[in-house]
């Protein structure tokens, strides 16, 4: 059973800022999801072959190819922040280890 403190830890690990009221609201929701997984684990899958996707489609994405863009300056000017000839983006990874 997931409690409020565990929801707080999960939110911290996911880098989410949630209020104590949201922690209280999410605990029963997460417990409901876990109960559903418990139900799924009761299914007999002995004779079900493993699969990686529900339908057999593969390579449905476009091929990667480089393209030139004529107006580099206007592209750089449209960025919220730039540093020299590069876009400056917020840092998404840090070194604190949990």
Curated annotation (Swiss-Prot):
Coiled coil: none annotated. The keyword Ligase applies. The keyword Protein biosynthesis applies. One of its GO terms (biological process) is glutaminyl-tRNAGln biosynthesis via transamidation. It holds the Pfam family GatC. InterPro entries: Asp/Glu-ADT_sf_sub_c, GatC. Keywords: ATP-binding, Ligase, Nucleotide-binding, Protein biosynthesis. Heterotrimer of A, B and C subunits. PANTHER family: GLUTAMYL-TRNA(GLN) AMIDOTRANSFERASE SUBUNIT C, MITOCHONDRIAL. Belongs to the GatC family. Allows the formation of correctly charged Asn-tRNA(Asn) or Gln-tRNA(Gln) through the transamidation of misacylated Asp-tRNA(Asn) or Glu-tRNA(Gln) in organisms which lack either or both of asparaginyl-tRNA or glutaminyl-tRNA synthetases. The reaction takes place in the presence of glutamine and ATP through an activated phospho-Asp-tRNA(Asn) or phospho-Glu-tRNA(Gln). This is Aspartyl/glutamyl-tRNA(Asn/Gln) amidotransferase subunit C. It comes from Rippkaea orientalis (strain PCC 8801 / RF-1) (Cyanothece sp. (strain PCC 8801)).
């Amino acid at each position: 059973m997931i409690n409020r403190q565990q929801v707080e830890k999960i939110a911290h690990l996911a880098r989410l800022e949630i209020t104590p009221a949201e922690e209280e609201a999410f605990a029963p929701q997460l417990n409901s999801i876990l109960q559903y997984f418990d139900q799924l684990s009761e299914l007999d899958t002995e004779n079900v072959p493993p699969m990686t996707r529900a339908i057999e489609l593969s390579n449905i994405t476009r091929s990667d190819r480089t393209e030139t863009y004529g107006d580099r300056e206007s592209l750089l000017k449209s960025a919220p922040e730039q540093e020299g000839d590069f876009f400056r983006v917020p840092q998404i990874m840090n070194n604190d280890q949990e």
